[in-house]
């Protein structure tokens, strides 16, 4: 069941992540300890994500920034779907090539950072491209660290495009049952 207070907090966090990343502090949330991860300036991606550990709580937020620069839009238009195994490679799961390019730019750093947390309720969120990356990250982290680190997941996305084929949807729904995709009209 949707927690609308949590959804509203996710909206605010998604809004905050669009600020200048170098000066971002989430000062409206003094009980949050942030870790920032961004892709290296390689000319192919501009992926930015904040991992926010809510102090005195078992809650952790992963907030992805959406399309902000022209390089983001170039990745958005790489529609072709490809198999990107997040597991053993024997899969029919396919993902949007551009979104995976953006995700893989920060994947290693993100998984390394997430390996430091145990027993957390992980709230993954993002707007637009950030919502697509949140969807991919939740599936990847759940598969690779979820049981090992005793992590539970909820996903709140806003205006997120679809990221994969039907096999991906089935895998995702089986692993992330608490996922809420908010769209407006024909989003």
Regions found by a protein language model. Give the residues of each.
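Non-catalytic, mobile gating and regulatory segments of ester bond hydrolases
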Residues: 1-125, 129-187
């Amino acid at each position: 069941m949707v927690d609308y207070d949590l959804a509203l907090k996710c909206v605010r966090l998604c809004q905050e992540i669009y600020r200048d990343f170098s000066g971002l502090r989430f000062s409206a949330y003094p009980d949050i300890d942030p870790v920032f991860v961004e892709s290296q300036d390689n000319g192919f991606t501009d992926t930015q994500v904040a991992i926010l550990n809510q102090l005195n709580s078992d809650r952790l937020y992963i907030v992805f920034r959406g399309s902000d620069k022209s390089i983001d839009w170039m990745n958005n238009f790489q529609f072709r779907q490809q198999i990107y195994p997040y597991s053993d490679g024997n899969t029919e799961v396919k993902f949007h090539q551009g979104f995976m390019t953006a995700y893989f730019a920060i994947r290693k750093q993100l998984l390394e950072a997430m390996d430091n947390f145990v027993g957390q309720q992980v709230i993954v969120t993002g707007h637009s491209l950030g919502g697509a990356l949140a969807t991919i990250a939740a599936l990847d982290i759940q598969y690779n660290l979820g049981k090992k680190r005793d992590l539970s997941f909820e996903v709140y996305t806003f205006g997120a495009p679809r990221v994969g084929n039907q096999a991906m949807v089935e895998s995702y729904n089986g692993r992330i049952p608490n996922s809420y995709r908010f769209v407006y009209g024909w989003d």
